[in-house]
């Protein structure tokens, strides 16, 4: 909040802060403003666009790299530019993906649970593998995927990857394969870094998990929709893979980022995720560092000003 206020003062802009995301219940609060920026993690209803147009809004600046919460054509039809923050701190997410991997492989949660019970024995259940001896599969080699691969490269691992658009620079530290299935079959760790699209919805389903090594781990600091949660839980229960670290959940918008410490969670699937012994869940927090928060805010609000002053922005996605 202080960073945002400082930006507003520096740029002579008046800001109104709303705690919630944009919904049909609070859309009336936009009236009287020249620009709009939101950190959406639920779909913007199509009926919102004509209302925003009526309010004189010409853009929505999404404060994240992902923009799958918007109907881009519908927004464009009403003269509304959608922008994103294509790269704000890939290092933040990459470091978290590495951290999640280490927590899985080194069985941190199991060790913590034993320690809290004052059971300090060295047992086979907490004996770990060695990342250095593993093959890492990176799905998606955009900004975040490449940084993640570089960090893994520092462990001395073999890195295989899949992306529709291969990056020449990345070929110096990873090897591209012709399909996701080929990457999965070779990998001890599979880390996801592809944008959410209609084509990759539930791409990682039970059938895909059948191609995993039984000893392999899945790390998703990407988008929840890429993973079929029911399929993942079944695969874990059936021993198709050893564990998963999820920083996102396909129906998370009902819960994240909100405080449910004194509320009941009425999503049985989410409860299964939270309680599953082979899943490490974190609340979409991989990006949440001082650097990324500052960059997200500054880049998104700069996009608002660009549209207001020039009619367009370099971060436009529609």
Residue spans of the language-model regions?
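An N-terminal-biased, well-structured beta-alpha scaffold segment characteristic
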Residues: 1-82, 205
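Short, conserved active-site loop motifs that form the nucleotide-linked donor/cofactor pocket
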Residues: 13, 80, 174-175, 278-280
């Amino acid at each position: 909040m202080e960073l945002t206020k400082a930006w507003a003062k520096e740029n002579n802009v008046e800001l109104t802060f709303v705690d919630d995301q944009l919904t049909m219940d609070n859309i009336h609060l936009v009236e009287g403003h020249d620009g709009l920026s939101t950190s959406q993690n639920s779909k913007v209803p199509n009926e919102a666009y004509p209302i925003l147009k009526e309010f004189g809004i010409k853009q929505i600046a999404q404060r994240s790299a992902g923009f799958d919460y918007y109907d881009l054509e519908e927004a464009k039809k009403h003269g509304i530019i959608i922008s994103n923050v294509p790269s704000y701190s890939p290092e933040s997410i990459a470091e978290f993906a590495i951290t999640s991997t280490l927590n899985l492989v080194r069985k941190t949660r199991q060790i913590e649970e034993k320690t809290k019970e004052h059971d300090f024995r060295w047992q086979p259940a907490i004996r770990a593998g060695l990342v250095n001896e593993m093959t890492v599969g990176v799905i998606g080699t955009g900004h975040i995927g490449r940084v993640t691969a570089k960090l893994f490269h520092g462990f001395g691992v073999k890195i295989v990857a899949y992306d529709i658009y291969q990056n020449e620079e990345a070929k110096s530290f990873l090897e591209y394969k012709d399909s996701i299935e080929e990457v999965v079959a070779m990998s001890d760790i599979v880390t996801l870094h592809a944008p959410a699209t209609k084509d990759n919805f539930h791409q990682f389903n039970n059938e895909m998990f059948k191609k995993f090594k039984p000893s392999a781990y899945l790390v998703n600091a990407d988008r929840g929709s890429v993973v079929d949660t029911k399929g993942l839980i079944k695969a874990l229960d059936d021993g198709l893979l050893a564990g998963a670290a999820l920083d996102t959940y396909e129906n998370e918008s009902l819960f994240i980022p909100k405080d449910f410490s004194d509320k009941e969670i009425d999503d049985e699937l989410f409860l299964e995720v939270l309680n599953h012994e082979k899943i490490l869940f974190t609340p979409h927090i991989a990006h949440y560092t001082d650097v990324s928060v500052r960059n997200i805010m500054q880049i998104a609000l700069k996009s608002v000003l660009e549209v207001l002053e020039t009619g367009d922005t370099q971060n436009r996605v529609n």
